[in-house]
Swiss-Prot record:
It comes from Eremothecium gossypii (strain ATCC 10895 / CBS 109.51 / FGSC 9923 / NRRL Y-1056) (Yeast). The lineage of its organism: Eukaryota, Fungi, Dikarya, Ascomycota, Saccharomycotina. It comes from the Eukaryota. The active site is at 283 (proton acceptor). It catalyses: sn-glycerol 3-phosphate + NAD(+) = dihydroxyacetone phosphate + NADH + H(+). InterPro entries: 6-PGluconate_DH-like_C_sf (IPR008927), 6PGD_dom2 (IPR013328), G3P_DH_NAD-dep (IPR006168), G3P_DH_NAD-dep_C (IPR006109), G3P_DH_NAD-dep_euk (IPR017751), G3P_DH_NAD-dep_N (IPR011128), NAD(P)-bd_dom_sf (IPR036291). It is an enzyme of class 1 (oxidoreductase). Keywords: NAD, Oxidoreductase. One of its GO terms (cellular component) is cytosol. GO terms for molecular function: glycerol-3-phosphate dehydrogenase (NAD+) activity; NAD binding; protein homodimerization activity. One of its GO terms (biological process) is glycerol-3-phosphate metabolic process. Its EC number is 1.1.1.8. This is Glycerol-3-phosphate dehydrogenase [NAD(+)]. Coiled coil: none annotated.
Length: 424
């Protein structure tokens, strides 16, 4: 006979119940969620109509066509790779659907390239398709490709960063002086900024250099599947800036949910920016290792072992260096274990790791050969994590991360991986 009391009190049951409760809350209480945030969001004083009050009224109405913001939020996406273009598509669909909240036009900054003698921006704007990075997907007509990052960002209330993270410093320098003081940002970037003073989230890097609040978006999201409208989930993390003054202060959780949520792209908004960011960055390192064992033909058992050790090290890294992060984020959110599973099953990084094992070529060579101008973010994150762990004397506490570094950058044979994880 099953001991019902013991079952209900077990940690596994409690964790599953909490997840189910969150899912039910998201499915059946979206309207009350928006109303609650609209009521409890902090207010600010500004000349003329109070933008926050207008936003609250719109979000609390079941049909909001009769109310319109005096100045709707302008949204810009910085980046146009396959994930950048996919997020821009999602956002542009929502600015069309909610003209009371958002300006219809969405600018997408595009690094200008020549495609068969034509500018990529011209192709996108005329054919409504990113033929290089997201071919075969029709883009909304209100999504406008812009070759100038400064012009694209001008007057934007919300900036969505979605570029390879190794280019962030250069882009931020170009944006300085062109971002309005009241703007808000969401980072879809995966990686860290490492310096002599420590390891830093990329959202924090954006905040410090552009002086605007920045959240993060991450989840179990393979870009081609989202772009096709296949159902998936994601997590947006954003902390309301209590001590910030600006006209963008009414960009809160409810507004962000309206901006990113689609019938095929379900969004949960939380405040754990650190947890979401760490999970999104480190899963790419784990995916490289997963690719190694799959490429060696060791099968699913070995891949599962890599993911177990990887998840443990991801959580340990977050707790050690970003104590404000929440452990439950890694288990309950799409940006945690769900993203790890998806990335290890079919992302760019597992593809590169597998190809390294099968061909003997370097990660850098394969990135150029296989990814059509895209980046394998795990290659760069692996180096950043190693630099930081070496700097603070913690390398031995993260054997998987160090093993991936040694394989990618020092030529250690992949066959040594089990030995390097003996005590993990």
């Amino acid at each position: 006979m099953v001991n019902t009391t013991a079952l209900i009190r077990s940690p596994t049951f409690v964790a599953q119940f909490r997840v189910l409760k969150q899912v039910n809350r998201g499915l059946f209480s979206q309207t009350s969620y928006a109303r609650t945030h609209a009521r409890t969001s902090y207010t600010h004083t500004m000349a003329g109509t109070d933008r926050l009050q207008q936003t609250s009224q719109i979000l609390s109405r079941s049909t909001s066509s009769e109310i319109r913001l005096e100045r709707p939020f302008k949204v810009t996406v910085i980046g146009s790779g396959n994930w950048g273009t996919t997020i821009a598509k999602v956002v542009a669909e929502n600015t069309q659907e909610y003209p009371q909240l958002f300006e219809r036009r969405v600018d997408m900054w595009v690094f200008e390239e020549q495609i068969e003698g034509r500018k990529l921006t011209e192709i996108i704007n005329e054919q409504h398709e990113n033929v290089k990075y997201l071919p075969g997907i029709t883009l909304p007509e209100n999504l406008v490709a812009n070759p100038s990052v400064a012009a694209a960002a001008a007057d934007a209330d919300v900036l969505v960063f979605n570029i390879p993270h190794q280019f962030l410093g250069r882009i931020v320098e170009q944006l300085k002086g062109h971002v309005k003081p009241g703007a808000r940002a969401i980072s879809c970037l995966k990686g860290f900024s490492v310096g002599k003073d420590g390891v830093q989230l990329l959202s924090t890097y954006i905040e410090e250099h552009l002086h605007i609040p920045c959240g993060a978006l991450s989840g179990a999201n393979l870009a081609p599947e989202v772009a096709k409208g296949n159902w998936s989930e994601t997590t947006v993390a954003y902390t309301l800036p209590q001590d910030f003054r600006g006209t963008g202060k009414d960009v809160d959780h409810a507004v962000l949910k309206k901006l990113f949520h689609r019938p095929y792209f379900h969004v949960n908004v939380v405040d754990d920016v650190a947890g979401i960011s760490v999970a999104g960055a480190l899963k790419n390192v784990v995916a490289l290792a997963c690719g190694f064992v799959l490429g060696l033909g060791w099968g699913n058992n070995a891949a599962a072992a890599v993911q177990r050790v990887g998840l443990s090290e991801m959580i340990k890294f977050a707790r050690m260096f970003f104590p404000e992060s929440k452990v439950e984020t890694f288990y309950q959110e799409s940006a945690g274990v769900a993203d790890l599973i998806t990335t290890c099953a079919g992302g760019r990084n597992v593809r590169i790791g597998r190809a390294m094992a099968e061909t003997g070529k370097s990660a850098q060579e394969l990135e150029k050969e296989l990814l059509n101008g895209q980046s394998s973010q795990g290659i760069y994150t692996t180096q950043e994590v190693h630099e930081w762990l070496q700097q603070c004397g913690k390398k031995d506490e993260f054997p998987l991360f160090e093993a991936v570094y040694k394989i990618v950058y020092e030529g250690v044979p992949m066959s040594k991986l089990p030995d390097m994880l003996e005590d993990a």
